[in-house]
């Protein structure tokens, strides 16, 4: 006797190339990045956002300037400023917003990530 078992299929994950804007890079963030690039005196720089293991919640965000673009990088442009995200990091950042905020407590780049299940108190690490 043969028994067939039907397993539910996993929901399909959208391919970032099929999304109009897989990540939101705000005007405020672009303006600050432009300012920082001008200080570095290198027009070829782009802001790379990435995810790495670490922090109190398991993953943490990283930011760095980069002149190199990989063929599979997501390249977003806002107001002439380029944001780069590698495919591995992008899977954790789909739908997120990269912003820059200034307040009485200081100024910083902020990632609002709808995929993060928990975040630490400082907001720089998260878990999925």
UniProtKB/Swiss-Prot annotation:
Keywords: Iron, Iron-sulfur, Metal-binding
GO MF annotations in UniProt: 2 iron, 2 sulfur cluster binding; 4 iron, 4 sulfur cluster binding; iron ion binding
GO CC annotation: cytosol
Residues holding iron-sulfur cluster: 56, 120, 122
InterPro entries named among the record's database cross-references: FeS_biogenesis, FeS_cluster_insertion, FeS_cluster_insertion_CS, FeS_cluster_insertion_RrpA, HesB-like_dom_sf
Record flagged with keyword Metal-binding: yes
Keyword Iron (UniProt): yes
Entry-linked Gene3D superfamilies: HesB-like domain
Cofactor binding notes: Binds 1 iron-sulfur cluster per subunit.
GO biological process terms, semicolon-separated: iron-sulfur cluster assembly
Cofactor: iron-sulfur cluster
Subunit structure, as described in the record: Homodimer.
HAMAP family named among the record's database cross-references: Fe_S_insert_ErpA
Protein family per UniProt: Belongs to the HesB/IscA family.
PANTHER family: IRON-SULFUR CLUSTER ASSEMBLY 2 HOMOLOG, MITOCHONDRIAL
Role according to the record: Required for insertion of 4Fe-4S clusters for at least IspG.
Protein name, as recorded: Iron-sulfur cluster insertion protein ErpA
Organism per entry: Xylella fastidiosa (strain M12)
Lineage: Bacteria, Pseudomonadati, Pseudomonadota, Gammaproteobacteria, Lysobacterales
Gene (name only): erpA
């Amino acid at each position: 006797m043969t028994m067939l078992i039907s397993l539910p299929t996993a929901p399909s994950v959208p391919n970032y190339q099929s999304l109009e804007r897989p990540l939101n890079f705000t005007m405020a963030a672009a303006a600050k990045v432009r300012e920082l690039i001008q200080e570095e005196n290198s027009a070829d720089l782009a802001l790379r956002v990435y995810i790495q293991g670490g922090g109190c919640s398991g993953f943490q965000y990283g930011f760095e300037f980069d002149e190199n673009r990989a063929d599979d990088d997501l390249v977003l442009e806002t107001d002439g400023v380029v944001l780069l995200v590698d495919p591995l990091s992008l899977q954790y950042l789909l739908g997120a917003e990269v912003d820059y905020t200034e307040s009485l407590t200081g100024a910083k780049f902020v990632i609002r990530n709808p995929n993060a299940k928990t975040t630490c108190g400082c907001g720089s690490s998260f878990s999925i």
